[in-house]
Structure formats: C-alpha cells, structure tokens
C-alpha cells in the first residue's frame, strides 16, 4: 500500500501520544503507508480559565478536528473516548475503538497515600463534575478546587503546592510515563469512571469504506462492546460534561456488567444502577440501564 494518511490531533502531550500510538500501529501493519500528524489547537485547549461545563462541553476538544476532516486537511481524527460527546455529527462516525488502558481514576499526591488519608479540609484539584459529586459523598469536608490544563500542567500545580492532591485518569498518567505518580487507583465503589475513560477512538467521515478497511485491524472487540454499552447509556440519558454522569462496563466470559450513575452536586442525590447481559446486547443494555435510571428520576436530576 502506497498511501499517505493524515491524522488530526490536539497538541496536548497526551493527545500527541495517542495519535503517535495510532500512527505507529498503522505503519507497522502497512510498511508502505506514510502517516502524518496534523496538529490542531482546539477551543477547549485555549480556554483554561473556565470549567468545561460553562464553555460548551467536551465537544470543544474535537470540533476543529472534525472541520479538518471535512475540509480534506485530515483523513481521520484520534480522540480520548471520554472527550467524544454522545452525539456525533451525522457526517462522521467512530471507525475504530482501540484496546482500553486502565479505566479508573487516580489519586495523586506528594504527601498522602489515598483519599481516606487526606486531612480535614485538604485541597483537592479536579474540574470534573462526576469526580466532584463522588468525592463529596466520601469526603464532604474536602475543599474541591477547579483544575484545568493538560496532565503536565496539573502535575506542576500539585508540585508547586497549590493542592494537597489532584484526581486524574490513570490512563493518561500511564501513557505519558507518570504511572509512578499514582498513589491510589480509586476503586469503582468510591469513584465510578467516566463513560469511555481509558479508550482511544478514531473518528472518520461517514461511510468512508477505504479508511474503515484501513483502520479495521486496530479495533479491539472487547473494548468496543464496553464503550458501546457505556455510550448507549449516556446517549439515552443525554448526558454531557455539565452534569455528573458515570458509566462503567466490564466483560467476563462474554457477559457484560454495566454500572451507571447520575447525580446532583448541590443536593448530593445519587442514582446508581447495574445491568447484566450478553455482549451482543451491549447497546440495548446501555439503553435499558438509562431507562432504569430515568424511572428513578434521572431526567429531573439532569435538568437541575
């Protein structure tokens, strides 16, 4: 195959790692393929003084990448799946989901070993509504302070003494070589992960069969089933980053367990449900779990 493939990517260290990972995988499969990274600065990267929920959500991290594909400047875009909104413009589709890295959240601190180890009124940095909600349940005494920026920026703020601890995704830390900074992998029962956390997705033009065939070898089937279930739940709930929604699927012997969570930071109300079934029913299970949460009052919580 003699072809050039252009990958649209954000310019953060983690985004570049992910794009480079896809580039390396493809070049190994297709020795005659030339892969070029098209580095793009998105609005989400530029606006760092406001929380994502106030400036338009996680779609701000991918819109410019989609425009690059539409204009023919790029062929595909590589994303962290947790940054991909539940609604994708009809001109695009997810062509591949790669094998997931550790999907859990990480407790990172220079002085304390876990959330439980933090002193009263300790300062904890995070900008995630989902993390804030769950932190307030297990440690209502903590001072939770908004923290934006890439992984390196957040770690520097911790090292400069602005926080006693910060919460990040394990996957990003591991991929960037900061796995040793993880003091605690926060257990699922304390902090349910974000929908799609730890997975890399490739977005392409809708019905682009040539590109679809090209990236097909990168698809991880088990991760795909998990993400399909999680995203189906999120889509049915119409959950964005402005509301605390968590979704986490596991697979064992082709049986999927999906846990979903919806909450309200102000009232402290949390709804949490599980559903089980065969992986072939991943999307249906996600919708059914969302409907169970809706029956419990999830829509009212999300409206608030």
Swiss-Prot record:
Pfam families xrefs: Porphobil_deam, Porphobil_deamC
Entry GO CC: cytoplasm
Cofactor binding remark: Binds 1 dipyrromethane group covalently.
Annotated catalysed reactions: 4 porphobilinogen + H2O = hydroxymethylbilane + 4 NH4(+)
InterPro entries in alphabetical order: HemC (IPR000860), Porphobilin_deaminase_cofac_BS (IPR022419), Porphobilin_deaminase_N (IPR022417), Porphobilinogen_deaminase_C (IPR022418), Porphobilinogen_deaminase_C_sf (IPR036803)
E.C. designation(s): 2.5.1.61
Top-tier EC class: transferase
Keywords: Porphyrin biosynthesis, Transferase
Pathway named in the protein's UniProt entry: Porphyrin-containing compound metabolism; protoporphyrin-IX biosynthesis; coproporphyrinogen-III from 5-aminolevulinate: step 2/4
CC cofactor: dipyrromethane
GO biological process: protoporphyrinogen IX biosynthetic process
Recorded family membership: Belongs to the HMBS family.
Protein name: Porphobilinogen deaminase
Origin species: Vesicomyosocius okutanii subsp. Calyptogena okutanii (strain HA)
Lineage, highest ranks first: Bacteria, Pseudomonadati, Pseudomonadota, Gammaproteobacteria, Candidatus Pseudothioglobaceae
Protein's gene: hemC
